[in-house]
Amino acid sequence: METWRFIDHCSFSGAENMAIDEALLQEAINNHGAPVLRFYTWTRPTLSLGYFQKAQEEVDFSECEKLGVEVVRRPTGGRAVLHEFELTYSIVGSIQHPKLSGTVLESYLKISKGLLLGLKNLGIEGEIAEGKKTSDLSAICFEAPSWYELTVMGRKVIGSAQVRRGDYLLQHGAIVIKMDVDKLFRVLKFKSLEQKERIRASFHRKAGAIHDFSSREFSLAEIKEAFLAGFSEGFEVNFIRSELSLKERELSRQLLREKYNTREWLFRF
């Protein structure tokens, strides 16, 4: 059976996590390496913005400062995610690889099958969603599922985003364990109070977390084990535990210094 790398990381800052993900992508391009799966968490609450989001228009930086929330821009698209009580995954690999090949949506579907099996390993029956249009778009990622994202009883529990460079992709996503809705709605701006209250009122019908659908609370280790097994079964691969290479560490530090820790990157839109 084919072998992929698995990196099991602890907590990093938002900027560090984005720098590491991009470093893995860039080094995969440089070295044509095997696909990599990484699990990680966050040292403090972090609001990550999609690549094209407008930080000044959509983020309440005053509230972020009061609440100790870091703000970072992702290299991937999509909408804002508040990372706190979650396990985050990232996958890097070649789109020429048969297990990751195809269009963006086709590779999304292949990755989502592993996520679906991860939920099943926790005793949670999820579904792979078909995207739906909404007339009341907000900055919030979990406000509505996109194509091939994971839902449970119609509520989005895993949100993902992807970027491609040449023949390689990076996809990362939030596996939400529990959600602080109050904090999420405090750190984002809305067009009006009416819009904010309308979206918030419907939010619980559209978004959920693992602990909303289980009679017991899982440890982080149990959740990691469930999703690692899910990806292994979904992709039909073995994972070998790995660490960042010297070049990956050096590049992540460079990206942190020159990109993800800079105001130029955060406020580029």
Curated annotation (Swiss-Prot):
Keyword match Transferase: yes
Catalytic reactions on record: octanoyl-[ACP] + L-lysyl-[protein] = N(6)-octanoyl-L-lysyl-[protein] + holo-[ACP] + H(+)
EC number(s) recorded for this UniProt protein: 2.3.1.181
Residue positions of the active site: 141
PROSITE patterns: BPL_LPL_CATALYTIC
Subunit text: Monomer.
Full protein name: Octanoyltransferase LipM
Highest classification ranks of the organism: Bacteria, Bacillati, Bacillota, Clostridia, Thermoanaerobacterales
